[in-house]
Amino acid sequence: MKIDVSRLSAAVNDAHARHAQAPGGANASYIPYLAKVPSHLAGVAAVTVDGDQVVAGDADYAFAIESISKVCSLVQALEDHGPDAVREKIGADPTGLPFNSVMALALHDGKPLSPLVNAGAIATVSFLKAANAEERWKKILAMQSALAGADIALSDEVNQSEQTTNFHNRAIAWLLYSASTMYSDPMEACEVYTRQCSTLFTARHLATMAATLAAKGRNPLTGKQVLKPEHVPSVLAEMMMEGLYERSGDWAYMVGLPGKSGVGGGIMAVVPGVMGLAAFSPPLDPAGNSVRGQLMVADVARTLGLNLFDRA
């Protein structure tokens, strides 16, 4: 399936025009940095597997990646250990509960189930092949940059805001440790996980990351093979099951694309073999997904007939 660039451009611009001022939602308030991001911002981007780029609105505004970073640490874990080990040690099942749920751990004897919820992501960071925190962090940051096709940087302001409010995640890390599902020092893993959520991305960067996954692990802008092609299906399966937390089922039902959201207002979706889509707008629904971002990405997907469950 190949999409004409002029048709893609029309779909992206129309989606932005229709939904950039959609009502509803509110900025994440529990992280001080996120609470003060201008809520009117809205951008959408598409990057094809051939490297074509189409953007509209605030697609180049830099925002905190937050939970979308979980995809990057999952990719690194797959590269370090392979899909079987990741499935055994972390899991490959949706929790059906909020992304920071402690109950999910209690219900499953301390196993985090999915690398795309907080418990699983912290465990994933601990599972990476690394001798210490800095080595762990450098691998994750390098992976973020390779997937985005850009020099991704840590925001000290976001990191400070997160590190001083991550009490819940610290508790999760100790619960994992008590259940023997933590594979490094728990506070080291939690600190590095918090850092990985504090880097700055744009919607264009997210669309490039999604396009890299759409292109079987090859970044269409840099030409670099970022991850092994055989690891991509594992990433997309996790995104389809848990990428939008307890709204993942609704997203699959309505949009039919593997996606991942973050409380910074970003969202991305992968159209295998075709393109990556992404959007950014800070106001969130109760599950922590961008209200306008979902609308914009869903609009483009619907206009172009991209639903994976509705393709001949």
Swiss-Prot record:
Subunit structure: Homotetramer.
EC number: 3.5.1.2
SUPFAM superfamilies tied to this protein: beta-lactamase/transpeptidase-like (SSF56601)
Protein name: Glutaminase
Natural source organism: Bordetella avium (strain 197N)
Leading EC class: hydrolase
InterPro entries (alphabetical): Beta-lactam/transpept-like (IPR012338), Glutaminase (IPR015868)
Family label: Belongs to the glutaminase family.
UniProt keyword annotations, A-Z: Hydrolase
An MF annotation (GO) of this entry: glutaminase activity
A biological process from GO: glutamate biosynthetic process
